[in-house]
């Protein structure tokens, strides 16, 4: 199946490669990220469990969902969790490569998916990276940087700061790419409202105070690109209340929002080779799409460019935090294609911080700082050079991702790359 309106995804090649080799594969990610569209292009039979009539048939006999020409795509499989066991049994019974594709917008609350380990391969899909938005052809490959050898860094970008900010608020959800202005804001508001009013309920949560969930999301958005404690986020969400909800009340919000892939924190990096003393372990906060954070905070491209400050528990200009979130989203997409993991580094007290650490399977790393602006000075690279001194040969390269016009290497070896010029 080919769709002329389809936006090619970095994950497409990975999906096709795995489908040729494994019998069952599940594609996970938030609603609207493009899972169904990517999977449907490879499927011969499609079962949509968000259609009541199809769900009723499958609920009567889960094995009926597996019938038909293969690959069989089972969309929104989590609406009837026994499907997972049916697929697992089919794999155990000898289903060949490329038999089943499952797509889901949530992780069920039970341990069903854990029992599929080794039988059903899982792939994560995120909103569009900057490369996938087709603003400019990249000149630098993240995979090449991970390969080491100091690849040549060159290229010029005509993507301006205004263009980057427009992309932050425009969203990486494929279905929203043609929208702007009021229509886009309305769709993003509707997306957020559905999370609070419907998705949490479908996940089995009784939401007694929907406004508190919305306020928690808003406080989390204000903490974008920080390691603010969840206690501080809870306090910010409930400021002004005489009696604050307990941690036990608010923790389920976070857990379910992570299972819906709306909350998408970057974990702390734990070195697998050289130990580094005094590393802290809190995650760095990000929502699935920085446009969701902007909408929750009422930010527009104009207010971001005017220097709007992040609300507590964030600090500093909001545009910097959201640009880092856009960069983190993009790097995570590219790193997955390169079979690498992404974390962040922060020592206790915050005296050393590196925004993104991309780790290869062998434990060697690519260290990345994110800088809003084009001019990169010695202060911007000091933590990168510190890490290089600390673990030496285990750093394959160091990078500053910027909004500047040119990609180049500094005399100290740090690569300066506009985000628009970085691709997979």
Which residues does each PLM region occupy?
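Conserved lysine of the Walker
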Residues: 35
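Hydrophobic positions on the alpha1 helix immediately C-terminal to the Walker A/P-loop
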Residues: 38
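Interdomain motor-coupling "hinge/lid" segment immediately C-terminal to the ATP-binding subdomain
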Residues: 105, 110-226
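Accessory nucleic acid-recognition modules appended to NTPase machines
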Residues: 181-364
């Amino acid at each position: 199946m080919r769709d002329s309106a389809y936006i090619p995804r970095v994950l497409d090649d990975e999906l096709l490669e795995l489908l040729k080799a494994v019998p069952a594969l599940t594609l996970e990610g938030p609603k609207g990220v493009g899972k169904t569209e990517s999977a449907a292009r490879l499927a011969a039979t499609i079962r949509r469990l968000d259609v009541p009539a199809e769900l009723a048939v499958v609920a009567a006999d889960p094995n009926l969902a597996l019938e038909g020409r293969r690959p069989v795509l089972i969309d929104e499989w989590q609406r009837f969790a026994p499907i997972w066991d049916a697929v697992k049994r089919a794999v155990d019974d000898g289903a060949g490569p490329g038999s089943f594709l499952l797509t889901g917008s949530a992780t069920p609350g039970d341990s069903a998916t854990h029992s599929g380990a080794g039988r059903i391969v899982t792939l994560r899909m995120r909103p569009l990276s900057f490369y996938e938005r087709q603003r400019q052809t990249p000149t630098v490959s993240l995979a090449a940087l991970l390969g080491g050898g100091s690849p040549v860094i060159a290229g010029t970008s005509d993507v301006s700061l205004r263009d980057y900010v427009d992309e932050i608020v425009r969203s990486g959800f494929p279905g929203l790419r043609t929208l702007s202005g009021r229509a886009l804001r309305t769709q993003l508001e509707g997306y957020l409202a559905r999370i609070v009013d419907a998705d949490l309920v479908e996940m089995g949560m009784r939401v007694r105070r929907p406004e508190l969930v919305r306020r928690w999301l808003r406080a989390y958005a204000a903490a974008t690109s920080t390691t603010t404690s969840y206690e501080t986020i809870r306090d910010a969400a409930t400021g002004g209340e005489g009696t604050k909800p307990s941690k036990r009340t608010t923790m389920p919000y976070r857990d379910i929002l992570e299972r819906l892939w709306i909350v998408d924190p970057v974990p702390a990096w734990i070195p697998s080779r050289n130990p580094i003393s005094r590393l802290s372990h809190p995650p760095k906060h990000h929502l699935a799409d920085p446009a969701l954070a902007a909408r929750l905070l009422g930010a527009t491209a104009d207010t971001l460019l005017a220097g709007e400050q992040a609300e507590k528990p964030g600090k500093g200009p909001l545009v910097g935090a959201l640009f880092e979130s856009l960069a983190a989203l993009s790097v995570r997409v590219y790193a997955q294609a390169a079979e690498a993991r992404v974390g962040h580094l922060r020592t206790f007290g915050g005296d050393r911080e590196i925004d993104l650490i991309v780790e290869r399977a062998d434990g060697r790393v690519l260290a990345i700082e994110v800088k809003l602006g084009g001019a990169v000075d010695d202060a911007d690279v000091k933590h990168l050079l510190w890490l290089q001194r600390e673990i030496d040969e285990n750093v394959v390269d160091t990078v500053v991702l910027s909004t500047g016009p040119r990609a180049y290497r500094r005399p100290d070896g740090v690569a300066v790359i506009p985000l628009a010029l970085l691709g997979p």
